[in-house]
Amino acid sequence: MAGRYDSNPFEEDDVNPFSEQARGKAGGQPSYGGGAFYMPNPRNVPSVSSNSRLSPLPPEPAAFGATVDIPLDSSKDLKNREKELQAREAELNKREKELKRREEAAARAGIVIEEKNWPPFLPLIHHDITNEIPSHLQRMQYVAFASFLGLACCLFWNVIAVTSAWVKGEGVKIWLLAIIYFISGVPGAYVLWYRPLYNAMRTDSALKFGLFFLVYLFHILFCVFSAVAPPVVFEGKSLAGILPAIDLISKNALVGIFYFVGFGLFCVESLLSIWVIQQVYMYFRGSGKAAEMKRDATRGAMRAAF
């Protein structure tokens, strides 16, 4: 039996394979430990010379120094642009100061610059109840504005009703009168009574209130007259009132219905207008504007007399 510290007969010697002695020994002795890679005569294997190595590729320059053409403005161009911007800024400041000076001069002269803002899709007039009319008068002004729009609606429907009567053989004269009512009635109402009321509410002017009352009474009379449409002008058929509606319903039901609708619209407009003038008159009396208007009228009469 082998001892505890006996050497292993299968253990290889501690030999440095890179030493010259080991190289000579390996060249002189056959090797049987190669297994499947055993070579009977290692001398027949051609040796690899140092000159058989692959030559390295030639070095290529790195792209760190590649130039990119980026157009940069010179300092002279930058200075020119800066001067141009400064000139534009100075011109804008000059225009702003001039506009401010004109606005202040207009304000001192009592001139109010009004921007057209209504209707929104095609501004024709300046109308801003929320910002220009006192809060306690806004409801009254809105109802007056509704009566103005109601008159425009009545006259427009009147054109439709009279057009249907003209198509059914009632003559072209009534249609021309209906067109005249619409073209002259809507802008006339705005200029003669709605705008004076708007300015009276905004400036609290007794004289403008008086102009409104005078013209608005004629407006109410016209609405009542249109609702009845007596046979005064062209048998009254130029207005869609109750009397021509009764006359036409027996001839043509559709035309008669159009006239009855017009009669209803004129009735609603008359009632709304009566409510407006009543409310405005109550405010006019309660605020002391009636007495102020009397004093102004007395002063005007005395000045005219002397």
Curated annotation (Swiss-Prot):
It is a multi-pass membrane protein. The gene is SCAMP1. Keywords: Cell membrane, Coiled coil, Cytoplasmic vesicle, Membrane, Transmembrane, Transmembrane helix, Transport. InterPro entries: SCAMP. This is Secretory carrier-associated membrane protein 1. One of its GO terms (cellular component) is transport vesicle membrane. Belongs to the SCAMP family. Pfam families: SCAMP. The keyword Protein biosynthesis does not apply. It comes from Oryza sativa subsp. japonica. Probably involved in membrane trafficking. Residues 25-36 have a biased composition (Gly residues). It is found in: Cell membrane; Cytoplasmic vesicle, Secretory vesicle membrane. Residues 1-66 are annotated as: Disordered. The lineage of its organism: Eukaryota, Viridiplantae, Streptophyta, Embryophyta, Tracheophyta. Residues 1-141, 278-306 are cytoplasmic. Residues 72-109 form a coiled coil. Residues 40-55 have a biased composition (Low complexity). The chain crosses the membrane at residues 142-162, 174-194, 209-229, 257-277. It comes from the Eukaryota. The keyword Membrane applies. GO terms for biological process: protein transport.
